[in-house]
């Protein structure tokens, strides 16, 4: 696996920024036990590191439809047959919302600036 310094080599500044935000998202998701979306972010990170021009579109696909990345809330716990919020759920979701919004903005800007079919 590449270190943060190695991952940015050969990437545009916009792709480096997207890589950084998506990496933060992946860590936040994994830290809360959210495997599905963490794996999605890992695939986008790998695509960015490989120079795949479709990486922004791969990320943007996570945002559409029911059950999408937009619908995710962190800090939930289900134990002993009961749903409850973790003590840090508010902070987790504030951070998730900020990163999720920034990732969408960056991916959209990169996609829109890239010539070719979508």
Model-derived segments and spans:
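Amphipathic alpha-helical interaction modules
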Residues: 32-80
């Amino acid at each position: 696996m590449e270190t943060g310094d190695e991952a940015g080599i050969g990437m545009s500044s916009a792709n480096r920024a997207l890589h950084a935000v998506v990496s933060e998202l992946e860590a936040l998701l994994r830290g809360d036990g959210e495997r599905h979306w963490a794996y999605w972010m890992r695939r986008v990170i790998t695509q960015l590191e490989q120079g795949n021009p479709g990486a922004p579109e791969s990320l943007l696909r996570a945002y559409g439809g029911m059950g999408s990345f937009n619908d995710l809330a962190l800090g939930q716990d289900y134990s002993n047959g009961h749903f409850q919020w973790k003590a840090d759920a508010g902070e987790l979701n504030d951070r998730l919302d900020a990163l999720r919004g920034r990732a969408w903005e960056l991916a959209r800007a990169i996609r829109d600036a890239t010539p070719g079919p979508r």
